[in-house]
Structure formats: structure tokens, C-alpha cells
Curated annotation (Swiss-Prot):
Residues 164-251 form the 5'-3' exonuclease domain. Mg(2+) binds at D105. Binds 2 Mg(2+) per subunit. Only one magnesium ion has a direct interaction with the protein, the other interactions are indirect. Binds 1 K(+) per subunit. The potassium ion strongly increases the affinity for DNA. This is Flap endonuclease Xni. K(+) binds at L172, A173, P181, I183, I186. PANTHER family: 5'-3' EXONUCLEASE FAMILY PROTEIN, FLAP ENDONUCLEASE XNI. The keyword Metal-binding applies. Gene3D superfamilies: 5' to 3' exonuclease, C-terminal subdomain, 5'-nuclease. Residues 185-190 are annotated as: Interaction with DNA. Belongs to the Xni family. Its cofactor is Mg(2+); K(+).
């Protein structure tokens, strides 16, 4: 059975970079990223490995909602200048890069789902909990920094909803980290309570007459924003990826791996 280790490139590298005392020390970054990737290979023993990078194009999400991810700090200039050399170094370790046109998340999600549907196992290396919506028994998420798999049961308990409701929760309450708006006046706790009662967005919006006038008014006025928020939060899992699985085989003997543009 294929086991595909899919690394969220900037999620890994920016966290490692943030821990380096000298922001211009690209050699230390290269050493630490190499060490992290070596450890990932040793821990998981994948048959295939890829590291997926964000691209420079404006994402379809930002085109749809210009405030999406607004206010995020830009990549530090030394890291931006040294990133290509790091990617080329990883290729010599047989870790192929995939360059997304815009956001890496949709490419990662598509790779994971395609692997799972082909009866393989996909392990996403990222701390981004947005991947938790990929509800498939052969897709898991690994937090390299805490050396543990994402605990879905603990996340369900923290959020107060089932995994199948994660997207509905973000549609109602939004996601401050990504500047996904949700419905004004509906916070995470009230959204979770509504979903406990009504289970789905469609049932909730068809049941507004059963709610108090004030809350029903908020929901009715925010219905279109909830739909937009759901779309922004939902990962695309069916992108046309022109790749060949053999290009991502993990070998013990390092050799240059292809860098694949999407």
C-alpha cells in the first residue's frame, strides 16, 4: 500500500525559521529543515513524499472575498530570498516540490484525497487545522512540532461539534485566523449550540421560525455571508494535478527530484 507523506511547505519552514535567532542565517534554516524532513522520513517510512508550496498568484478565495487572510504578515525578506535555494537543496534529498499557483492547501487536499481513494494512506504534515475537514479513514494529519497526530476527538470536544460539522461551524462563526467572516453576532459557542440542535446549515435555515426573533433575524440577514464563508473554508479536493506518482517515490539514496509547477 502506498503511503504518501505530504508536507505543507511554508507551514513547516516558517515555524522553523521563526525559531532561528539570526533571520539572515539561511544555513541554519537549511540544516533544521533537513533535520525535520529526515525525522519525518524516519518516523513515518513513507513510500512517497512531496512538499507543497504556496504560489504568488492571487487565490480564488481572495478574488471572491478580498479581505480573506487580510492583515497577515508578509514573508520575511531573507526567507523569501533564500527559499528557492532551500527548495533546490530538498530536491537533492529526493524530496520533490510541488508549486501551487496560489494556496498550497487545495493541492495538498487533492493529493490526500486522491491517495486515499486509490486505497493508499495520506499523511498531511501541517499544524493547520483546516485539514481536519478531510474526513477519511486513510487521511491523517501529523503535527511535526508536537510529534503527534491531530486528535480529532479532542478537537470535536473543544469546538463542541462533530467533525462532519466543522465547515458548518466556520460558516456560522467564521475563522479569525483566515479572516473568514461568518455571520455577524454569531460566535463559536452559539454556533455550536445551534448545530447541536439543528445538525446542519440547511436544517437550521429552514427552522428560523422556531428561533427567537433576534437570533432568527441575525441568521436570516447573514445567510449569504454564511454561504460565502462555507465556500471560503472548504478545501478543493478535485484539482487536475498533472503529476506522476513515481516522481515522488521516497528512496534511501538521495538523488535530484523533480520540481513540479501547478
Amino acid at each position: 500500500m502506498n503511503k504518501f507523506l505530504i508536507i505543507d511547505g511554508l507551514n513547516l519552514v516558517r515555524r522553523i525559521y521563526a525559531a532561528i535567532p539570526d533571520e539572515n542565517d539561511m544555513e541554519s534554516l537549511k540544516e533544521r529543515v533537513t533535520s525535520a524532513c529526515t525525522k519525518l522520513l524516519r518516523v513515518h517510512h513513507p513510500s512517497h513524499i512531496a512538499i507543497v508550496w504556496d504560489g504568488d498568484e492571487i487565490s480564488w478565495r481572495k478574488q471572491l472575498y478580498p479581505d480573506y487572510k487580510k492583515g497577515r504578515k508578509p514573508m520575511p525578506e531573507p526567507l523569501a530570498q533564500g527559499l528557492r535555494a532551500l527548495q533546490e537543496h530538498l530536491a537533492t534529498l529526493n524530496i520533490a516540490s510541488i508549486y501551487a499557483a496560489a494556496e498550497a492547501d487545495d493541492v495538498i487536499a487533492t493529493l490526500a484525497v486522491k491517495t486515499a481513494k486509490a486505497q493508499g494512506e495520506a499523511i498531511i504534515v501541517s499544524t493547520d487545522k483546516g485539514f481536519s475537514q478531510l474526513n477519511h479513514p486513510r487521511i491523517t494529519q501529523w503535527d511535526h512540532f508536537n510529534q503527534q497526530y491531530l486528535d480529532i476527538a479532542a478537537l470535536e470536544q473543544k469546538l463542541g461539534v462533530d467533525r462532519s460539522q466543522f465547515l458548518d461551524l466556520m460558516a456560522l462563526a467564521g475563522d479569525s485566523g483566515n479572516k473568514i467572516p461568518g455571520i455577524a453576532g454569531i460566535g463559536p459557542k452559539s454556533a455550536a449550540e445551534l448545530l447541536k440542535t439543528f445538525r446542519t446549515l440547511s436544517t437550521l435555515f429552514s427552522s428560523l421560525p422556531n428561533l427567537g426573533a433576534k437570533q432568527a433575524k441575525k441568521l436570516a440577514e447573514g445567510k449569504e455571508m454564511a454561504r460565502l464563508s462555507y465556500k471560503l473554508a472548504q478545501l478543493q479536493t478535485d484539482l487536475p494535478l498533472n503529476i506522476n506518482l513515481k516522481d515522488f517515490r521516497a528512496n534511501s539514496t538521495p538523488h535530484p527530484a523533480p520540481n513540479i509547477e501547478q
